[in-house]
């Protein structure tokens, strides 16, 4: 299967970017920074604890823009958004650090993490062990591995590097073939199902529902993309999916944390359910 055009462009640029970063700061220095970073906050555990109680385990995303939608939020202050998400009941944060396609930055992750007590995933296109060590150096608690962007050997190498520096791994799949590869190659408990097709950028929540029966019960399913309203949340919860990665619905809201609380915790006659941020 050929790599989709948008993803191919992103990956080609990412390879150049990694080379540029390595030329600026060598691996030994990044490793030193990683060793001196604050201790990881336990990204996987934060999600697993919520899901075990059958409460929404929300990874709330801090994302200024995307290739398909352009700028999502003009007033973009990561620290402010992070505090809002924490108050709204998020379990974890996701921060985009890709510069060229998502207008992200390493600084956004640092600012967001410093402003709250939540664990943070570095949302980027990971293709080199250097990026994994770098993620820990800038304060990330977890990294994303996108199966469609990696072969099995590299995927395993990146996961091993993550483990060596204390990072959790969220592996992202979109179809049955990718899921099979992920389950065979990695032992991470976190399996993300991207409802957005990276070939077409179309979104369907059926992607998560179709793949659910193939996922072992000891893995936590994180449904990603396309959760826009209460009906979407209930569709997942009735299928015992309690972990969600949501960005666009929050980024377009005046108060992202309030929108999170409304979408996930305010229901059944207005009663707020489980909205404590711990």
UniProtKB/Swiss-Prot annotation:
Family matches, as InterPro entries: Aldolase_TIM (IPR013785), Indole-3-glycerol_P_synth (IPR045186), Indole-3-glycerol_P_synth_dom (IPR013798), Indole-3-GlycerolPSynthase_CS (IPR001468), RibuloseP-bd_barrel (IPR011060)
Xref: Gene3D superfamilies: Aldolase class I (3.20.20.70)
Give the signal peptide, or none: none
Q: What class of enzyme is it?
A: lyase
Answer yes or no on keyword Cytoplasm.
no
Q: Does the keyword Lyase apply?
A: yes
Q: What SUPFAM superfamilies does its record include?
A: Ribulose-phoshate binding barrel
Reported EC number(s) for this entry are 4.1.1.48
Catalyzed chemical reaction(s): 1-(2-carboxyphenylamino)-1-deoxy-D-ribulose 5-phosphate + H(+) = (1S,2R)-1-C-(indol-3-yl)glycerol 3-phosphate + CO2 + H2O
Which pathway does this polypeptide act in?
Answer: Amino-acid biosynthesis; L-tryptophan biosynthesis; L-tryptophan from chorismate: step 4/5
User: Could you tell me the keywords of this UniProt record?
Assistant: Amino-acid biosynthesis, Aromatic amino acid biosynthesis, Decarboxylase, Lyase, Tryptophan biosynthesis
**Which Gene Ontology MF annotations are present?**
indole-3-glycerol-phosphate synthase activity; phosphoribosylanthranilate isomerase activity
Q: Which Pfam families did the record assign?
A: IGPS
Q: Which GO terms describe its biological process?
A: L-tryptophan biosynthetic process
Q: Which family does it belong to?
A: Belongs to the TrpC family.
Q: What protein name applies here? A: Indole-3-glycerol phosphate synthase
Please tell me the species this chain comes from.
Answer: Pseudomonas aeruginosa (strain LESB58)
Its organism's taxonomic lineage begins at: Bacteria, Pseudomonadati, Pseudomonadota, Gammaproteobacteria, Pseudomonadales
Q: Per UniProt, what is the name of the gene that codes for the protein in this document?
A: trpC
